[in-house]
């Protein structure tokens, strides 16, 4: 696992966006050989999306031959709802780049058969071979996507009941009214994420410090699904200084020395 300890969330976003752009450009995707990118929603990746848009506008990256798969979507929330993840992705990213509409994949939380929708999603991912890079965020309780604590580390795309902690955290997007937050979501599984060629997690803020500690220093544990990243051969965690507060000093120093070049690239 790589841990890239930066100073600020702005540096985290800038490094992550540049890494994505570099991966796409190095891959040299074509219509017959697209680059497959996994994407999250939420507050953490917002600045990364803004930076990717800036790189696109500067002519430094194109999404013409990029296929995307989003992590999750609420169940029962219309696509047009202002807080649906469909709306989030188009408003904050897709509407501002040259991605082809047919290359955008987001789970449909309004189908009559959720199990069938989840199977379809898994098959669609497999049809491209693999996801080349999956970017993600992390919840305060260490969940990745909507794989809440005690989720199976071998799980696949499925419907999940959201925990009270998640409902409270997400209520800020619903007028701070927890009763308005959907209670269920469709989400890729932990194993789905681990199947990706590379997984990059963005962890920022004091409130994510325990999750970062569990990810980097803890044991692999289904109560902290983020810890499953330890099993991945190409896992990257990009964090800011506040998120490192629960890590051992020697851990931060170790990775700071290892990642000197990466750190200097955003200074």
Curated annotation (Swiss-Prot):
Keyword Hydrolase in record: yes
Superkingdom, taxonomy of origin: Bacteria
Gene Ontology BP terms: carbohydrate metabolic process; glucosamine catabolic process; N-acetylglucosamine catabolic process; N-acetylneuraminate catabolic process
Residue numbers annotated as active site: 72, 141, 143, 148
Record has Hydrolase as a keyword: yes
Signal peptide positions (record): none
InterPro entries, alphabetized: Glc/Gal-6P_isomerase, Glucosamine6P_isomerase, Glucosamine6P_isomerase_CS, NagB/RpiA_transferase-like
One Pfam family linked to the record: Glucosamine_iso
Summary of activators and inhibitors of this protein: Allosterically activated by N-acetylglucosamine 6-phosphate (GlcNAc6P).
Pathway: Amino-sugar metabolism; N-acetylneuraminate degradation; D-fructose 6-phosphate from N-acetylneuraminate: step 5/5
Parts of the chain that traverse the membrane: none
EC number(s) per entry: 3.5.99.6
Subunit structure: Homohexamer.
HAMAP family: GlcN6P_deamin
Protein name, UniProt field: Glucosamine-6-phosphate deaminase
